[in-house]
Amino acid sequence: MGYTKLNLKDGNIVDEKVFQHIDNNFSQLYDTVGDYSIHISFDDTVACLTNLTKNTYTSLFDEPFFGWLKGLHDMYGAKFSLYVYNLTTLSSVPTTYKSEFFEARHWLKFGLHSKQSGFNYSSETYANAKKDWNSLASGIIKITGTHQSIDRIPRLHNFSASLEAATGMRDAPCGVLGFLAADDSRVSYHLTEAQNAILKAQSQYLDKENGLIILRTNYRGEWLNSADGMYEMMESFLSDSSYVNCFKPFVWFTHEPYVYSASNGLTDKAKVVEDVCKFAYDYHIPFTYPQNELNIKP
């Protein structure tokens, strides 16, 4: 067996299932990630989805978190990934906002973080992980009307997944192309210590044997001691030679509860996200999704 034909649209692989079988030709299919770009994502995403379930809005963007994201998109061209922390919450979201989600598909995508709070995939089976990804994908398509709203290189809880879980998610319809790894020295997902060392040094590891690309997370918003200074921090990375591989793309994230709660709205920490967006805009660094930066060869 080999690969199904790859059809691309807006940088997204649109086949129902990309890999029929992973073989030694993987290196001919993928090259490296490209020029400078930035990816912004939110782990533990649940509050904004809960609001869509519990409240009725005239527009999707009347929900405060989604409205804030749209404001950043409109002002800076920012794009975001929301990594879902509870599949039950996702399945409860109504289809009321499908047309707006569909229109936002090029700048707002969803991926899996965990099927429920506190759960990681370090010991999960192939079948169960594949089932969870199926639930994630079908839930996203239900509320957005398109598979183009799926982020296929997500960040799983604790940066953890057994090889069985990783390949189960890979083999699901609209399955993963890879994962976003840890922002520290811990070993991520199914990698060995040696593979993780390559990842840390190069900010990416191409797992040819299993058909997965692993990208290092470069910064988390919570590292900053205050809400001020994120812009200057990002500027410093441009002149730091140790970050030479890190803008291909620069993988920046925070957690939804750090910047937003369903009951209290946006926190003062939302400024760190706003500063990253302004920095990228000012320095002409495009916003992207890692899946769109893969150089997929014909």
Mark where each language-model region is.
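Conserved aromatic-histidine-acidic binding/catalytic patches
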Residues: Y30, T53-Y57, Y121-N128, I153-N158, ...
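Loop/turn elements at helix/coil->beta-strand transitions in domains of secreted/extracellular proteins
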Residues: G34-S37, M75-S81, R105-K109, T146-R152, ...
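Well-ordered, non-membrane alpha-helical segments in soluble/globular domains
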Residues: N55-K70, S91-S99, A127-I140, A227-S239, ...
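Alpha-helical structural signal in soluble globular domains
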Residues: G71-M75, E100, G139-I143, G168-G175, ...
